[in-house]
């Protein structure tokens, strides 16, 4: 999720530079709702249901790998790839910097393939026809520098911005979320997200529970977002909150609608944090092994908490990072109160 969201300002800049261009996006199926509302057409004139791109090409690589030798898998892959090539793209842009994405960009049929000169995975650059020396410390700024090269005009870093609410608006989902919140007395709420991609980035669930308890005492309903396989994580938060925390989980479209209404978001370096930042929701970001200067929340009011003892690493360790354990729940509550104007 985060990689997609970090690309949106670059897309916004390209759309501004080429307002009449047909822009498509090749994306994993599980993240397609960030670009197009469920059930909406994935190609054609842009609308509130698909506001930024003219066409969404979704691939389900995870499922395809599980049934690699199935005829139906190859048929689905061929259908997607025929759609990509039939679109007649002249330029492909790889902002992920992975071998997989670079190869797909080269095979798209586009005559020109842009990418960073020093991508995330070094061999990816072998597939680019034009390599851009990316500048800027934050990944959003680095992505924008590639867009600058394509547009051949300067898009200054201070102008880096997300389009105002860049995500699809499904009115039925929006109405349902609003009704559900009202029915459960959660008109004023904080959204907490204790999960993360791997254990080293995960602040202890018990401390999220303590934060939830403090927010409830301050008059905010603490809603806890969690995904499949994170049920035990929520139960630990609930227990530590003294029963104050309330669960919420659902589709990406539902998470977007919920996040739009949050007073504040609290979580670590994970997709929902960057979603909240893109929606300009104030965030308290709890960082450990990843560098907030490169991967932190961007474009919103924020307080980033990171211990001086944390060491930048992308090793996917299961145990919590030592420096992150030095951040107490009271520090998070102080940051939340500051952003909420409660001090």
Predicted segments, located by residue:
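Catalytic machinery of carbohydrate-active enzymes
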Residues: 1-343
């Amino acid at each position: 999720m985060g990689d997609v969201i970090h690309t949106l300002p670059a897309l916004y800049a390209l759309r501004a530079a080429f307002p009449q261009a047909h822009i498509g996006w090749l994306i994993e199926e599980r993240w397609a709702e960030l670009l197009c509302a469920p059930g909406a057409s994935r190609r054609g004139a842009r609308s509130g249901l698909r506001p930024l791109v003219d066409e969404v090409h979704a691939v389900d690589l995870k499922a395809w790998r599980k049934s690699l030798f199935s005829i139906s898998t190859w048929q689905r892959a061929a259908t997607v790839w025929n759609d990509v090539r039939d679109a007649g793209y002249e330029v492909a842009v790889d902002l992920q910097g992975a071998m997989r994405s670079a190869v797909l960009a080269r095979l798209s049929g586009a005559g020109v393939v842009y990418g960073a000169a020093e991508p995330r995975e070094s061999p990816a650059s072998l597939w680019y026809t034009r390599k851009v020396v990316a500048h800027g410390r934050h990944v959003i700024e680095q992505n924008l520098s590639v867009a600058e090269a394509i547009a051949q005009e300067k898009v200054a870093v201070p102008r880096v911005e997300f389009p105002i609410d860049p995500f699809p608006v499904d009115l039925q989902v929006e109405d349902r979320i609003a009704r559900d919140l009202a029915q459960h007395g959660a008109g004023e709420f904080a959204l907490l997200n204790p999960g993360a991609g791997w254990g080293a980035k995960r602040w202890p669930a018990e401390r999220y529970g303590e934060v939830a308890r403090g927010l409830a005492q301050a008059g905010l309903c603490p809603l806890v977002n969690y995904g499949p396989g994170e049920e035990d994580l929520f139960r630990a938060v609930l227990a530590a909150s003294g029963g104050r925390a309330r669960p919420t989980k659902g589709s990406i479209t539902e998470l977007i609608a919920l996040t739009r209404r949050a007073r504040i978001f609290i979580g670590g370096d994970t997709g929902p944090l960057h979603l909240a930042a893109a929606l300009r929701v104030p965030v308290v970001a709890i960082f450990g092994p990843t560098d907030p200067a490169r991967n932190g929340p961007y474009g919103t009011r924020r307080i980033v908490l990171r211990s001086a003892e944390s060491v930048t690493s992308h090793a996917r360790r299961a145990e919590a990072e030592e420096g992150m354990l030095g951040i107490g729940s009271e520090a998070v509550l102080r940051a939340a109160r500051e952003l909420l104007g409660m001090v």
